[in-house]
Regions:
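Short intrinsically disordered terminal tails
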Residues: 1-2, 47, 113-124
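Short terminal alpha-helical segments
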Residues: 1-48
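N-terminal regions of proteins, emphasizing targeting and processing segments when present
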Residues: 13, 82, 123-124
Length: 124
């Protein structure tokens, strides 16, 4: 769980960095991290089935984020959303658009919160 927490902090900081180049965000570094944590790239199908448009729309994610408690599901959604920009988007630079950045920041913040909560509970 500590590795998931560190992943969420690391990538949250990257997405918050106003000076980061899009290549750093769409290069395979995130994929390597996600795969090593056991997250699955499923084109956001599982997350979309449960949360609909929140799988790729920031405003929808804002409305349901507190309902998200499944760490592997959220991690896989982050991985799959990243893969869209890495592989399918017209331009990988779209990942830098404010609404896309905001989606990742919100999802990563929730992942950080859930993993930290899990770490604390396991220490009790």
């Amino acid at each position: 769980m500590k590795q998931i927490y560190e992943f969420a902090v690391k990538w949250g900081e990257k997405f918050r960095d106003p000076n980061i180049g899009y290549i750093e965000l769409v290069d395979d570094y995130m994929a390597d991290d996600c795969a090593s944590l056991g997250f699955k790239m499923d084109c956001v199908h599982a997350f979309s089935e449960k949360y609909g448009e929140a799988s790729n729309k920031h405003d929808a994610l804002v409305r349901i984020i507190d309902e998200v408690t499944d760490i592997p599901l959220l991690g896989s959604a982050i991985y799959s959303q990243w893969r869209y920009f890495n592989h399918w988007a017209y331009s990988g630079a779209e990942i830098l658009h404010p609404e896309n950045r905001a989606w990742f920041i919100l999802a990563l913040d929730r992942l950080e919160y859930l993993s930290r909560k899990n770490i604390v509970q396991s220490q009790l």
